From Swiss-Prot:
Protein name, as recorded: Effector protein BipC
Organism: Burkholderia pseudomallei (strain 1710b)
Bias kind Basic and acidic residues: ranges: 71-94, 380-392
InterPro entries for the chain: BipC/SctB
One Pfam family, short name: IpaC_SipC
GO cellular component: extracellular region
Source lineage: Bacteria, Pseudomonadati, Pseudomonadota, Betaproteobacteria, Burkholderiales
Location in or out of the cell: Secreted
């Protein structure tokens, strides 16, 4: 197989074409898109150099023989196509301004390959001029070190696509940073909500411990006061009521003596006296009338004198007992007040704890809302990035189509050279 240019008599064999293509391949082969593009560019440059060298030699020979020299004009893209491309890229750029940058490394890698392979109009023209000058005598070096640019990449729409890719690469880091900030914000809000949960639990535990301790203390104090009240009543019964009862009994017996009831009488052995023990412990002896019908006047007088004193002592025992009851009542009241105060204090602690828990729950709600907002923003950001990736893919497809069109133009140039 060979490629021939009929008007110039140039024939390039298949082996030579393979050698030229192999000379422009990268050491890494076609493992990556960028390396494959570079290999293709070098092969095209080498082919153009060889063709240019032989065409130049043939042209010089023809010029020496006096033949007419024919110059081929560079093909120009259709104006309508260029306008359509510009409108397409303009729309992509406007869409890109509303969307986030792409996060897919594969997409950014393809943009790298496109940017490195193609340049703007001025760079393309300069590269083309240099290629024409070096075509005659520098073919081997051009095959190895040819710039990775295309002379036909002079469409402004195509340059706009490349600029779009470069701008998207710059925005990748900002998009990732924003995603990280939103994620950290959601994480911080979640941690704050968890801290508020722990704070609410701690407040409940503190209120329970403090209220329980206060109520236990006041209940114990109230119980002690109630025990004192019962002890006072018991002491009053023992020291006041019992002596009072004994005095009342003795007083009644003495009253019966004064009325002549159950008065002592002489027995068969004719005892002439009787001994009476007073409440003071003193024993008094009274003489008994031998007639046995009545007490002596002295005996009756003594009993009559002691009756008011006994009645006074009985009344004083009753008064002291009443005082003891009043004292016991005060102690009972203190105990009740202590217990009631403990319950009131516990209620106050519960109220303060409930207020603190309410404030913590309000902060927890705010943190949860902040977390939900951050998650919603992150989701929106991710959706925008997804739409941006789709737009970037469309831009790449458009760039590929432009490259295919430019390759078709190059093929047309080669066809014109053959004819």
């Amino acid at each position: 197989m060979s490629i021939g240019v009929q008007s110039s008599g140039i024939n390039i064999s298949h082996a030579e074409l393979s050698r030229l293509v192999d000379a422009g391949k990268s050491e890494q082969g076609d493992k990556a898109v960028r390396d494959g593009g570079r290999a293709l560019a070098r092969a095209d440059a080498a082919l153009a150099a060889v063709v240019g060298e032989r065409v130049a030699a043939r042209r010089d020979a023809v010029a020496g023989s006096g033949a007419q020299r024919v110059e081929l004009a560079r093909p120009k893209p259709d104006a309508q196509t260029r306008a359509t491309d510009r409108r397409t890229v303009s729309g992509l750029e406007r869409e890109h301004k509303r969307l986030a940058a792409s996060q897919t490394p594969r997409v950014t890698g393809m943009h790298d390959a496109l940017v490195q392979r193609h340049v703007s109009l001025d760079g393309a023209k300069a590269a083309h001029g240099e290629g024409v000058k070096r075509a005659a005598g520098d073919a081997p070096r051009a095959a190895a070190d040819a710039p990775q640019r295309f002379a036909f990449a002079d469409d402004k729409a195509f340059d706009a696509m490349l600029a779009l890719g470069a701008a998207m690469q710059k925005n990748v880091q900002s998009d990732l940073a924003m995603q990280g900030k939103l994620t950290m914000l959601a994480h911080d809000a979640m941690m704050s909500a968890a801290a508020q949960d722990r704070s609410i639990g701690a407040a409940q535990m503190t209120a329970a411990i403090a209220g329980g301790a206060l109520q236990a203390t006041t209940s114990l104090g109230g119980a002690m006061q109630q025990m004192k009240s019962l002890s006072t009543k018991s002491m009053s019964i023992e020291k006041e009521l019992k002596p009072q009862a004994e005095l009342k009994q003795f007083h009644a017996e003495q009253a019966l003596e004064l009325r002549g009831i159950n008065k002592p009488v002489l027995s068969n052995d004719e005892v002439s006296h009787v001994k009476i023990k007073r409440d003071t412990g003193e024993t008094v002896r009274h003489e008994i009338d031998h007639g046995g019908e009545r007490m002596s006047d002295e005996h009756a007088s003594v009993l009559a004198q002691e009756a008011p004193a006994r009645q006074h002592r009985i009344d004083m025992h009753g008064m002291r007992h009443e005082e003891n009851l009043v004292k016991a009542g005060r102690q009972q009241m203190k105990g009740d007040l202590l217990q009631s105060g403990g319950q009131i204090g516990k209620n106050q602690i519960d109220g303060a704890s409930a207020q603190q828990q309410g404030a913590d729950r309000a902060e927890q709600k705010e943190d949860e809302n902040a977390q939900q907002t951050a998650m919603a923003a992150a989701s929106t950001r991710d959706e925008a990035a997804h739409r941006s990736r789709e737009a970037a893919q469309k831009a790449i497809d458009a760039a590929k189509s432009q490259v295919a069109n430019d390759n078709a133009v190059a093929a047309q140039v080669a066809g014109n050279l053959r004819t």
